[in-house]
Regions:
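Basic, alpha-helical nucleic-acid-binding regions used in initiation and control of genome expression
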Residues: 2, 6-60, 64-168
Length: 168
């Protein structure tokens, strides 16, 4: 049995069609769960209820730009964007260690610091969407995957310490 990958680009395209007021509402919320109080969320997910993975994506949509289909293969990884954007590694570790919803709130602050980074939305959305249940939390709580957060940290360090072509 295969599990189909969610269509993250369809979500991006629905976001692009939102009215300016709905986009503004997405920018103003303080944490992902507050999105449930706004029309914009239900416009993004017309076919069903948005679970925690989808909420994380909706929470970040206003703070990113997709690179576009023609540049998707050449678009830098998120870790490289964070390293190039002079993001302090301690802030990145705060995100990696934080529990939900503080992890995604802090991550959104990093995206804001990068000033609308142009990224491969499909790739980044896949990292943000991944969820895991932690035994210490209520049964219906699915937090952002620790493995996905570690991958962002690893990509950051690979980008930071890998010399550019021609450098020694």
């Amino acid at each position: 049995m295969s599990v189909d990958k969610p269509d993250f680009m369809a979500l991006w395209n629905r976001y692009l069609t939102l009215a300016a007021g709905d986009k503004a509402a997405l920018r103003k919320v303080g944490e992902p769960d507050e999105l449930r109080e706004f029309h914009a969320l239900y416009s993004l997910f017309p076919n069903g209820r948005a679970h925690d993975g989808w909420l994380r994506l909706a929470f970040l949509l206003p703070w990113c730009e997709d690179c576009g289909e023609e540049r998707r293969e050449k678009c830098p990884k998120l870790g490289k964007l964070l390293a190039a954007g002079a993001v302090n590694e301690m802030r990145l570790f705060q995100v990696a260690r934080a529990k939900s919803p503080n992890d995604i709130i802090q991550f959104r602050r990093l995206m804001i610091q990068l000033k609308h980074p142009t990224l491969n939305w499909d790739e980044v959305a896949s990292l943000l969407y991944r969820s895991e249940h932690r035994p210490s939390e209520p049964a219906n709580t699915w937090a952002w995957s620790g493995k996905a957060k570690r991958q962002i940290v690893e990509d950051y360090y690979l980008a930071k310490f890998t010399p550019a072509k021609g450098d020694k």
